[in-house]
Amino acid sequence: KIKRQEELTIYFYNAAIKNGWFDEKDSEAALLVKKDLRPLEDIIDTMNIHAWLQECIHDAEGRYAKLITKLTVTVPMIELEKIAFEFGKLHTVGKVSVQDAYKFFDDIFLNGMPCDRVNIITQQDNSCFSWEQTHDIHAEYWLAFQGYPETYYKLRKQVMLGMLDGSGLILESPDY
């Protein structure tokens, strides 16, 4: 999940460079992208796994929030939503059950530590799968950079829609 979060941050950064929203010489923006994407098992602190993972999550969430908040100053939200959708299409779920689609979502989105129990399944059958978020684990990162937590959810929804593209499945979620 951390790796996917880093991929999403890089995807937005590269799109910003390509579209001229950031200059490649903008060192502040470049610092928001983690270049070292080695497998976690190669860099994990096995003596303190829980704290190490929490720090990685905090770092990844914070850099993503700061990058997107920086972009929202000059880039229309519709453009950022298009980028999020395209990122989702890179990770399409294909023709899967609703349960498998949820698993794909759960595998790609960083929602804190497993012990945070952010998503609770509320219904599952062959035609419908629903869950509720028990608390907003992302808002603190966005607020820290004077961003709007709703931005995270708007972009996440577009990633999810991109992931479902061509699957025949429909995502119903609140508009933020």
Predicted segment positions?
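N-terminal accessory segment detector
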Residues: K1-Q124
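Short beta-strand
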Residues: I120-Q123, E172-Y176
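Short, hydrophobic/π-rich interface segment
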Residues: S127-P174
